[in-house]
Amino acid sequence: MNREMTSSFLLLTFAICKLIIAVGLNVGPSELLRIGAIDVDGHFTVHPSDLASVSSDFGMLKSPEEPLAVLHPSSAEDVARLVRTAYGSATAFPVSARGHGHSINGQAAAGRNGVVVEMNHGVTGTPKPLVRPDEMYVDVWGGELWVDVLKKTLEHGLAPKSWTDYLYLTVGGTLSNAGISGQAFHHGPQISNVLELDVVTGKGEVMRCSEEENTRLFHGVLGGLGQFGIITRARISLEPAPQRVRWIRVLYSSFKVFTEDQEYLISMHGQLKFDYVEGFVIVDEGLVNNWRSSFFSPRNPVKISSVSSNGSVLYCLEITKNYHDSDSEIVDQEVEILMKKLNFIPTSVFTTDLQYVDFLDRVHKAELKLRSKNLWEVPHPWLNLFVPKSRISDFDKGVFKGILGNKTSGPILIYPMNKDKWDERSSAVTPDEEVFYLVALLRSALTDGEETQKLEYLKDQNRRILEFCEQAKINVKQYLPHHATQEEWVAHFGDKWDRFRSLKAEFDPRHILATGQRIFQNPSLSLFPPSSSSSSAASW
């Protein structure tokens, strides 16, 4: 052990001993000191600023709780060594992978007894994206940001097929949930476009998995909320990247007509169609004041008051058509053909044209504006729901025209998806209907705003929305779920619960991983540690 390593080890030992004395941890000193002795190519840190940086998330809804230490890995084996230490200790301690910290309810937290693995690429020498143009895929580190995956694949004229609206999220983070945006109706979520994974299980094994190898783990990890393993590598399917995007928004005053048009657009299999279908709700004139307003400009103003509506709610359909510079005349004709089939308010067409990369990265530009006004790092009591098609009209009446009370405090997305684009073998949960909607209430709380913008008001409104769905027997499923009890989790997973629990017992029997999800009890104290641990290491 060289001088630098010795210094780091002593610092870590000192910090751990201080914590033992100060808070009376359940984990024994001899077990904790093993953390500092783990031989990794990356590094551990207990620096106060590093601990603080991983103790909160984008949601800012939980009181910060600093972990024992943070691991900055440089390889999957670094992650595996830490997890093997946790798994083999007399008293197992939590290990949580953290990507870009974009969770809402502390899902990536490890607690004061645990260690956070900082997966975000760039801190240490983790592998760079490796594009295979001939085979149309890219291999990426689990902590790579999607925006960097995009930049790398575009060098080869390629891009992933399915996206999220915001690109500053990690690959492992979105694949542990699903990863959805307006392309999901056609390509499915991001988890439907994965060819292969390397995963560090809760036993510290590095396992390669795909449709052909370790299939049960492969499907379990996709949408598995980090419960069975930490994704260290993903092989993502690619397609030829377009150069430009025709971006169109149109308004509706009738919810029925709005949803009929959306459902028509996602049903056009094998036909001329738009490449992206989303939508959002306008319950006040906040459309031009939220982070999705970058589409509009003084040259393309939105005069909501000039559009008549029956009541206070309008609906905006958002669609795009991808194309190459050489196809500009063709795209005009295609858009005209597609638009003729829709029944929007004729005077409400807003169109812009931009580079493909600029469209995909549109939310980040709005983020920079909000950051400049100190409006980004505020509490985000987001609520994301999958609503079955058969009950979306009831949801509109009860929530959009009812509970929300003509105030948004942020964007409200609504768009349909096709269930047959989701692999039922994954751990992701969707309603039991062939078409279902995402309804995403992406609100921000302000301490010095109106009462309807305060955190407690918005949290109470979320509670009322969930209560309304339960009382009205609208079988919604939470996306990016957060539940308080295991009974609620059992209800959430439904028919998938038995398999989910079985996977946990097989791949993380001591409940070490992703304890911040609060699905299972904290790391098992009753299971005696194994006498030895094996590792079927995979490399790439």
Curated annotation (Swiss-Prot):
Q: Which UniProt keywords apply?
A: FAD, Flavoprotein, Glycoprotein, Oxidoreductase, Secreted, Signal
What would be one Gene Ontology cellular-component term for the protein?
extracellular region
State which Enzyme Commission number(s) the record gives: 1.5.99.12
* Cofactor requirement: FAD
Which positions carry the signal peptide feature in this UniProt record?
Answer: 1-22
What is the native source organism of this protein? Answer: Arabidopsis thaliana
Give the family from UniProt.
Answer: Belongs to the oxygen-dependent FAD-linked oxidoreductase family.
List each copy of the FAD-binding PCMH-type domain by range: 63-241
Could you tell me which residues carry Pros-8alpha-FAD histidine? H102
Aminoacyl-tRNA synthetase is among the record's keywords? no
- State the protein's name: Cytokinin dehydrogenase 5
